[in-house]
């Protein structure tokens, strides 16, 4: 059963009427979620694996047997299905896929290998994002730069930042992947052996799979069977992650003014996508409950979100994926001022 709470009143919940949930503890919100949200069910977890494997197989059959002019459609399907593999690994990284850690680690490495994503590297960096969501200069996922940091950067860096926060937002996860996940200095000494293992796994996969693919199908086969679906996967990775925490209303705060409850409930966006995308990607778009507790498996996110809407509805941001939303994000959410919110690049002129 969901614990029902009375409607919140700013003066009753916070010393700051403009931030009515800032003084709440994260646990206060989690306690209102049904216990069923946290139940791991092996049948549902492995069903998600079967859905992903079936969708990927269907996509590759289409790439092989359908006429060449169908390739854009089969690439989109296959890349979206590969995003589902990432989400399976995502649950493994949060230990919400299986009860045994070794199962999570094994499945996570297998799911991430075709994406050339080092599992432990991602897991550790992603844990940091969850611990410091929307904390200025600490969060490592789409943390917007200040005007001062932007202006102090070299011209080439500013150019790349303009592109990624603007019309080329869909490449953002590629840069994040390449710059963050293979650099050992990004990780604590105690974690580096695990990171090295994960990097070795993806290097081994690439060393075996890529030459085999090129030898048997040529360079065009490499492009057709791996590169294009991989780019579609990164389109979704970039899109999902930027939408998760980037609309003009979302606030980023300095560490001394940061609230976990506010950041996770009121600093995260639920976005509806075409249903086939949500199915293939295992509801990764149902993101608010995931930020409240990473222990919620992906197949229970909708149950948790329904409870949040019932109890905390006024504090939730919900959007629908469309061109207008992406124009708003890429056209307005460029630089950040803690006092006034987002600023556009054009405002610097």
Swiss-Prot record:
The chain crosses the membrane at residues 46-66, 68-88, 102-122, 168-188, 199-219, 222-242. The keyword Transmembrane helix applies. One of its GO terms (molecular function) is oxidoreductase activity. It is found in: Membrane. InterPro entries: FA_desaturase_dom, FADS-2_CS, Fatty_acid_desaturase. Keywords: Fatty acid biosynthesis, Fatty acid metabolism, Iron, Lipid biosynthesis, Lipid metabolism, Membrane, Oxidoreductase, Transmembrane, Transmembrane helix. It catalyses: a 1-[(9Z)-octadecenoyl]-2-acyl-glycerolipid + 2 reduced [2Fe-2S]-[ferredoxin] + O2 + 2 H(+) = a 1-[(9Z,12Z)-octadecdienoyl]-2-acyl-glycerolipid + 2 oxidized [2Fe-2S]-[ferredoxin] + 2 H2O. It is a multi-pass membrane protein. A motif (Histidine box-2) lies at residues 126-130. GO terms for cellular component: membrane. Belongs to the fatty acid desaturase type 2 family. This is sn-1 oleoyl-lipid 12-desaturase. It comes from Synechocystis sp. (strain PCC 6714). The gene is desA.
């Amino acid at each position: 059963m969901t614990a029902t709470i009375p409607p919140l009143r700013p003066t009753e919940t916070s010393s700051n009427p403009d931030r009515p949930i800032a003084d709440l503890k994260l646990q206060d919100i989690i306690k209102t979620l049904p216990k069923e949200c946290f139940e791991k069910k092996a049948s549902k977890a492995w069903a998600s694996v079967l859905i992903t494997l079936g969708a990927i197989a269907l996509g590759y059959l289409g790439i092989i047997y359908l006429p060449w002019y169908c390739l854009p459609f089969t690439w989109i399907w296959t890349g979206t299905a590969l995003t589902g593999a990432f989400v399976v690994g995502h649950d493994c990284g949060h230990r919400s896929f299986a009860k045994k850690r070794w199962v999570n680690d094994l499945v996570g490495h297998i799911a991430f290998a075709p994406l050339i994503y080092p599992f432990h590297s991602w897991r550790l960096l992603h844990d940091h994002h969850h611990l410091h969501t929307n904390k200025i200069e600490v969060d490592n996922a789409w943390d917007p730069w200040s005007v001062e940091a932007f202006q102090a950067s070299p011209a080439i860096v500013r150019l790349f930042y303009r592109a990624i926060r603007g019309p080329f937002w869909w490449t953002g996860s590629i840069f994040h992947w390449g710059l963050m996940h293979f650099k050992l200095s990004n990780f604590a000494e105690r974690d580096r052996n695990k990171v090295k293992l994960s990097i070795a796994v993806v290097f081994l996969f690439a060393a075996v799979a890529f030459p085999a693919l090129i030898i048997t199908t040529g360079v065009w086969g490499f492009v057709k069977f791996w590169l294009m679906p991989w780019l579609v996967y990164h389109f979704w990775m970039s899109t999902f992650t930027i939408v998760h925490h980037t609309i003009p209303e979302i606030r980023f705060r300095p560490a001394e003014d940061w609230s976990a409850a506010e950041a996770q409930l009121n600093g995260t966006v639920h976005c509806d996508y075409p249903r086939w995308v949500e199915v293939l990607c295992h509801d990764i778009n149902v993101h608010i409950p995931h930020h409240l507790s990473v222990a919620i498996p992906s197949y229970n996110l909708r149950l948790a979100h329904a409870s949040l809407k019932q109890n905390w509805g006024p504090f939730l941001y919900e959007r629908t994926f469309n061109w207008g939303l992406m124009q708003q994000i890429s056209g307005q959410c460029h630089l950040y001022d803690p006092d006034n919110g987002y600023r556009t690049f054009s405002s610097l002129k």
